């Protein structure tokens, strides 16, 4: 099991202008993917509405089938560890969001 840590703003080199809390995310292996998920970004007043994101990793061959709220993301980056995979970082507003693809993907919302 592999985990990714995000430090508190201002700590351990995290200098992103005052946004962010500590977080730990368990990374799912590529053998454990999903084809559809609905996530929710909180509308709480103390959360900056433009700072909601979802990171999506999937096979490059299936990237054209990916839709976030019915729209195909266009900002793919070839995964540095394996050129057969791509990575998307999609900015979200608060509310519910549906991610769907013909092939499996892994998604992390924050």
Where are these regions (language model features)?
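Conserved functional hotspot residues at active sites or interaction interfaces
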Residues: 1-110
């Amino acid at each position: 099991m592999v985990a990714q840590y995000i430090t508190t703003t201002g700590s351990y080199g995290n200098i992103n202008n005052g946004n962010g809390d500590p977080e730990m995310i368990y990374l799912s292996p590529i053998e454990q993917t999903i084809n559809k998920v609905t996530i929710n970004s909180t509308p709480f007043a103390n959360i900056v509405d433009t700072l909601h994101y979802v990171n999506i990793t999937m096979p490059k061959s299936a990237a054209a089938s990916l839709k976030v709220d019915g729209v195909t993301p266009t900002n793919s980056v070839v995964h540095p560890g394996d050129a057969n995979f791509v990575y998307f970082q999609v900015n979200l507003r608060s509310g519910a969001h549906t991610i769907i693809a013909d092939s499996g993907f892994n998604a992390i919302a924050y």
